[in-house]
Regions:
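A short, aliphatic-rich beta-strand micro-motif
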Residues: 125-133
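Short beta-strand-to-loop transition segments that serve as allosteric relay/switch motifs
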Residues: 140-151
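Allosteric cytosolic regulatory segments
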Residues: 157, 161-172
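GAF sensory/regulatory domain recognition
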Residues: 33-36, 45-82, 216-219
Length: 224
């Protein structure tokens, strides 16, 4: 089987993972593993921004950390928090301009001057950044690391870009699912509270207190 067919097969498998899961954090490492089966950067990692806050990025991929994936409850942040200002300029460029940036040699590109010590320590030479975009907003980025022996073609970059789009879709699905679960939780709480208020209305006959309580519940559900 040719490498191109392997790529298409793995892309279909990644698409199926995304379609069948409502939790990106449960499948993120499997996605990266499938991607690296058919393209050969040394490793890849995913960083996320939470609530459109670009002051910090959260490293969430155990492929890079070589640790068990972190799983947090709804509403919690996932991953290792890193000051985004410490990232190389070309990563800021990729995020700001919403474009793929390929630095073939970090020791020759002035934009990578601040990461050269890390590159020596980790043993990589090149790096490619793929922004993760949801509804025209960058919600994170994936980076691929290359050593001197690694080769990567334009077709490989297109393939990784397709995977990045599927990762972004998975993040969007997860966000919508979490928002729905939060709303269900609020509705359940509101129903319980309204039932209690109804009992008080029956006993106290105080309609104003009851209406005030309904207003409070409506504000809580709508975040107003």
């Amino acid at each position: 089987m040719s490498n191109d067919i392997y790529k298409m097969r793995n892309l279909v498998e990644i698409s199926s993972m995304v379609a069948e899961s409502s939790d990106f954090f449960m499948i993120k490492d499997k996605i990266i593993e499938k991607m690296l089966e058919v393209v050969h950067p040394t490793k890849a990692c995913v960083n996320l921004f939470y609530k459109n806050n670009y002051k910090h990025a959260y490293l969430v991929c155990s492929q890079t950390l070589e640790k068990i994936p972190y799983l947090f409850p709804i509403g919690g942040t996932v991953g290792v928090k890193i000051d985004f200002s410490t990232y190389p300029k070309y990563i800021h460029e990729a995020v700001k301009e919403k474009k793929i940036v390929y630095v073939k040699n970090v020791f020759e590109d002035i934009r990578a001057i601040d990461e050269r010590e890390m590159a020596k320590s980790e043993g990589y030479v090149g790096r490619i950044v793929f922004p993760l975009i949801v509804n025209n907003i960058v919600v994170g980025f994936m980076t691929c690391f290359l050593v001197e022996e690694d080769t990567i073609s334009d077709y490989d970059i297109d393939f990784i870009s397709s995977v990045a789009s599927l990762i972004a879709l998975s993040i969007e699905i997860t966000t919508k699912n979490n928002n729905m679960q939060r709303l269900v939780h609020k509705l359940r709480g509101a129903i319980s509270s309204i039932n209690e208020a109804t009992k008080k209305l029956y006993h106290n006959k105080n309609i104003n207190e009851f209406l005030d309580h309904l207003s409070e519940q409506a504000c809580d559900i709508t975040n107003s």
